[in-house]
Amino acid sequence: SEYGVHGGAQISLRTDDIARITNAMQQLRTNPPKAIAGMPVSSISDYANGYEGLAPSDCLSYQLSGTDRVVVRPSGTEAKLKVYIEVVRDAKNDVDATRKDAMSVVNQLGESITQLLAL
């Protein structure tokens, strides 16, 4: 519990049309969400031109309140978008209850981003 409780998930959103993935990433860049699952987006990192010394990559990272974040990128090998969700909660009290809360938030974020991307 010294480092808090970490909840996470990887979601793969498949499609038969690779153009839908390109369009979804472009839509996220031109019309970024202001909130995901009701949680305000505090900053967006777009790795298309490189970022903090990293090579360019078709990847977007949405920082939410606190340390929660959602990362979206196309798969490099298949017609799908990959979504990574990370939620961190302070666990000074009941670790089990905190873990349940963190995973509940992970699930809410997953449902929200899946609806937003609508592949």
Task: Show the residue positions of the predicted features.
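A generic beta-sheet turn/junction motif
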Residues: 76-78
